[in-house]
């Protein structure tokens, strides 16, 4: 049995819809992350046993096994196997879990968990457009994302002002993190076509090395935004995650094999979880996933130094906080998807990457990463810095 550890983790910058990364095909985005994590670790890519890639909208340019074709696009060894998975927004976090599982099982001594979403080119939901009809006997009350976010706000008694305050917090923390250089180590800059008038074509290229989604906002500006779902709703564009392009990759190895190769293990995966949540609330799964992953590690909220709770909507994080009552100074310390963006198939691996680098920067010991996912699912991971 292997002892899985994280040896390296990288991510691309995150681009806005139609923005800096819109001219890159998903194979190029993900292939860049895959190749970068291998090259930065300094391992022979032929020693990677398997690749697990998360992607949500698996159609169009993201159809036909994007994880495998990204690997080949990057010029990496053809003999390495790959699996592309759909666990909705939890896809690449679950990809890292699967990479760790096969290392633990002794199937491989090295594996990559990664993910991509090129939402400018493959819009969310385009794989079921025009709307795929539900069965005539469908009786499950599972709302869309915005309706779910509003239901969660109702459930916890969260008001518009609280949500706006959290949206402002995300922007301010992310801006400060960039100013302090906190993301520099995890980012792998990418050469991308400069978008043309059609937003996905260009003849010039530019090196993209920074997240595009940050906004200089204020309480007044957020308060002036109209709710997405009309009068009476609470969530606005300022308290929801952004439509984005990006990729991330995490290299998992057996600890003994890594040390024998002269590589430095950087974190252990103490526990992982994938849970189903109550469909009526759809996106409230991080509450249950956190409880399960803590139980699996034999830990409590007080044992965790850093939390990364994906900011799909402000109410998702605040609902989670209402139940688990963490020290909020430990939660999303460098901002989250409201400010940085949410390339859905890549975000899980991005959160693990950011958590690893922040553990090292701050000298902290443990991190818990969790996120909601479509289909009333949620993933969670606990890392321990080595």
Q: Where are the regions a protein language model picked out?
A:
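Condensing-enzyme catalytic core mediating Claisen C-C bond formation in acyl metabolism
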Residues: 1-24, 219-284, 288, 295, ...
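Conserved beta-ketoacyl condensing-enzyme motif
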Residues: 22-110, 116-132, 187-208, 280, ...
């Amino acid at each position: 049995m292997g002892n899985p550890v994280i040896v390296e983790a990288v991510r691309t910058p995150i681009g806005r819809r139609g923005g800096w990364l819109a001219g890159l095909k998903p194979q190029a985005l993900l292939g860049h992350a895959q190749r970068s994590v291998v090259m930065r670790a300094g391992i022979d890519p032929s020693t990677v046993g398997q690749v697990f890639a998360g992607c949500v909208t698996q159609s169009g340019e993201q159809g036909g096994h994007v994880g495998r074709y990204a690997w080949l696009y990057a010029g990496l060894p053809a003999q390495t196997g790959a699996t592309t998975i759909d666990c909705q927004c939890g896809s690449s976090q679950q990809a890292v879990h699967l990479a760790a599982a096969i290392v633990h099982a002794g199937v491989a001594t090295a594996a990559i968990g990664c993910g991509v979403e090129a939402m400018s080119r493959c819009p969310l939901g385009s794989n079921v457009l025009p709307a795929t009809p539900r069965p005539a006997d469908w009786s499950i009350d599972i709302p869309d994302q915005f309706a779910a976010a509003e239901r969660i706000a109702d459930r916890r008694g969260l008001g518009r002002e609280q949500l706006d305050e959290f949206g402002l917090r995300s922007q301010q923390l992310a801006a400060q993190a960039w100013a302090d250089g906190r993301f520099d180590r995890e980012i792998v800059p990418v050469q991308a076509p400069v978008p043309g008038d059609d937003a996905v074509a260009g003849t010039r290229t530019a090196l993209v090395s920074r997240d595009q989604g940050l906004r200089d906002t204020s309480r007044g500006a957020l308060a002036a935004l109209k709710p997405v779902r009309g009068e009476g709703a609470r969530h606005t564009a300022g308290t929801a995650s952004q439509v984005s392009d990006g990729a991330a990759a995490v290299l998992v190895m057996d600890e003994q094999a890594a040390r024998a190769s002269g590589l430095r293990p950087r974190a252990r995966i103490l526990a992982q979880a994938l849970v189903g949540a109550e469909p009526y609330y759809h996106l409230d799964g991080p509450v249950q996933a956190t409880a399960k992953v803590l139980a699996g590690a034999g830990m409590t909220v007080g044992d965790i130094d850093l939390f990364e709770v994906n900011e799909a909507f402000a109410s998702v994080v605040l609902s989670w906080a209402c139940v688990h009552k963490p020290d909020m100074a430990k939660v999303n310390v460098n901002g989250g998807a409201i400010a940085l963006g949410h390339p859905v198939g890549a975000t899980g691996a991005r959160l693990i990457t950011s958590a690893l680098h922040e553990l090292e920067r701050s000298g902290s010991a443990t991190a818990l990463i969790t996120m909601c996912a479509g289909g009333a699912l949620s993933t969670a991971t606990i890392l321990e810095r080595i």
